[in-house]
Amino acid sequence: MEQKQEKFSTIGYIAAALGMCIGTGNVWRFPRICAANGGGAFILAWTIAMLVFAVPLLSTEMAIGKKARLGCIGSFRDFGGKKYTWMGFFVAAVCFFLMSYYCVLQGYCLKYAVKSVASFETNLTTDTTAAIWTSFTDSPAQVIFFHAIGFALACFIVYQGIAGGIEKFCKVAIPALFAILVGLAIYAVTLKGADQGLQYLFTIKKEYILSPNTWIQAFIQAAWSTGAGWGFIITYSNYVGEDEDVPTSCLIMGLGDNLGAILSGLVVIPAICALSATPEAATEALSQGNFGLTFIYIYQLFTTIPGGRFISFIFFGLLAIAAITSLFSMIEVGVKCVVDMGVARKKAVVAVCFAGFVVGCFSAWSLNNIDNQDWVWGLGLLISGAFIAILAIKYGVEKIRTEEVNAKGAEIHLPKWYFNTCMCIMPVLVVVMVGYWLLQTREWFPDTWLNPFIIQDNTGTVLLQFGVVIVVGLVLGKFFNCKTAKGRITKEENCR
């Protein structure tokens, strides 16, 4: 039975998309990755990655979703033919595994929001806040508890639907998040010692700008924070009107993501420098870029300022809200694929959320596990981006640009030289980056770099996890082709 298709308003669509962009990918991930990769050098590389990777990819995804009116699996089937269906499954699977560990991050934020109210202390040292962080993350029961709460909240809102749940929530949450980030950034940069952080953040160091690692991390961050390659823009674009301006919407997403990321950097990095005992200690903390950077240093910052309890609650509460707005899109990617196969939407929401919670318990068990998942599926995002580019090449890059991206009503037109060049070189660029990154693991783990059964950031674990997803996609390809509903451009021969 055909199910009623909900629609976003233009403002609601942009708010929901920004909800994905301005989540923990900016507030939690950007500062630590930026700090670990040289600050200013990383910002330059990341800006270039946004232009040559994220914006063209977001535009392509939006065009595909608007045209096909199906999820990732159906869109790949209809745009590329039935031999491309497994690629659509890979994109959806990458998003699912990202969702599974992403909710663990949301649980971290919920924990600190609760702690800010229930057991807030003043004038803590870095050692004390580091001990609090370690005590929490070393307790799987606590982490899984907050992980469960996070999924329950996200499931409840997505269950309400597109306009009644996701759009309504994001239109309030995103402006509030921007407001608190601006206020915290102003405060952080006025702290004594914050100038070292500003210098670190905006100084371009030669050794970092020439490092391939900086560029690879920049491209991963561009994908991670904008949602390029996740498949969520393909999914959300099912719910926009025919006259939605693709280039303008994607430009707003990119600029909003950039602003959110820079504001987050201005909050976290100057605060670390201001709160560290010595400049050397600050530099060491920044260069490590560990998972707890925000939860150790920003929490300590709040314990030292007037009204810290309230501000801490607001910050971590809004960070949890940012995370949950990102979760909406990840859940919706899986839900749309399941709904396309004839399952009722509300049943699909519950099934996807429950499966995500179960899989996410692996990441909740230890920091080592979540680091492994961040490593594997961060690379998976680049592969997903390459698959979307390959799909565009198969369908016709120029055809997508003229008929779908620069369609009638578009206020901004993406130039042929820019869009076509970026999309055509993207698969090669991804192969080079991922290949280099995987070969680097031979130096990091010379004895175990190909061992898939060790939880570390090595090549073996990537090949195993990618391999399982690809094999499942190939084996179930015919099932997906037959079971997935027909869209607006479906050809009968692709459904068998």
Predicted regions and their residues:
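Extracellular loop-to-transmembrane helix junctions
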Residues: 5, 34-60, 142-143, 381-384, ...
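Membrane-embedded translocation segments of transport machinery
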Residues: 2-7, 11, 167, 171-328, ...
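Hydrophobic alpha-helical segments and their helix-loop junctions in multi-pass secondary transporters
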Residues: 57, 102-124, 178-204, 273-274, ...
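C-terminal membrane-solvent junction of multi-pass transporters and transport-like membrane proteins
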Residues: 335, 342-353, 376-462, 491-496
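Inter-helical loop and helix-membrane interface segments of multi-pass membrane transporters/permeases
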Residues: 3-5, 32-37, 67, 72-90, ...
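Membrane-interface "cap" regions at the ends of multi-pass membrane proteins
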Residues: 1-28, 57-62, 66-78, 85-89, ...
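Transmembrane helix-boundary motif of multi-pass solute transporters/channels
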Residues: 12-47, 234, 248-251, 255-258, ...
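Membrane-water interface regions at transmembrane-helix termini and the short interhelical loops
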Residues: 33-37, 63, 79, 83-99, ...
